[in-house]
């Protein structure tokens, strides 16, 4: 944010300045440190407005979110052609899950259900469109909804959102331990060791 002109500072390739949507996760964790229910009540309309803006601006008919891959902050990764970044979509699921949890804190069953439903919708789409059984990994999608076969650290974000079932999670853990993919001396490389890049 530029204080001299009160304007957001954005990148050419990310004009909306979208980043990973993690505000509900942050508020949930803050609540568990402070137990300030009033803050949740006050911030919830802002969080809802933010989620609605993301839906209105970036959600596509396939149920996934098409954002610039720069939104992930991983601009050093070879993700050219990525239109549906797996990390952003996993974060949307994660944020929806925490929005539901915040609804529970407020004893708002309707709100909780709305975001729980959203979570499962995104989870289903990430699993059906971004998961590859052959390689046991989650991938970004291109504009044609085809998987980009570049294994990046972004493919592990679905685990944080509890998207994979036990079998898929085991495949991801195997990649973390596999010296041919992500099991390197310096853990969690941006790219898989067998990357074509």
Regions found by a protein language model. Name each.
Residues 1-64, 85-89, 93:
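Aromatic-rich carbohydrate-recognition surfaces in CAZymes
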């Amino acid at each position: 944010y530029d204080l001299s002109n009160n304007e957001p500072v954005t990148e050419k390739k990310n004009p909306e300045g979208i980043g990973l949507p993690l505000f509900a996760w942050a508020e949930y964790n803050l609540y568990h440190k402070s137990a300030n229910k009033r803050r949740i009540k006050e911030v919830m309309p802002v969080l809802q407005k933010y989620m609605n803006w993301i839906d209105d601006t970036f959600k596509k008919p396939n149920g996934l979110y098409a954002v610039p891959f720069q939104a992930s902050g991983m601009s050093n990764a070879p993700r050219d052609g990525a239109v549906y970044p797996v990390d952003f979509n996993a974060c949307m699921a994660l944020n929806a899950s925490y929005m539901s949890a915040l609804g529970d804190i407020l004893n708002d069953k309707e709100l909780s259900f709305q975001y729980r439903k959203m979570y499962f919708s995104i989870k289903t789409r990430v699993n059906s469109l971004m998961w590859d059984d052959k390689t046991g990994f989650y991938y970004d999608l291109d504009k044609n909804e085809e998987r980009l076969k570049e294994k990046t650290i972004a493919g592990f974000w679905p685990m944080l959102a509890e998207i994979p079932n036990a079998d898929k999670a085991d495949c991801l853990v195997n990649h973390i331990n596999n010296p041919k993919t992500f099991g390197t001396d310096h853990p969690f490389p941006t790219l898989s060791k067998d990357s074509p890049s």
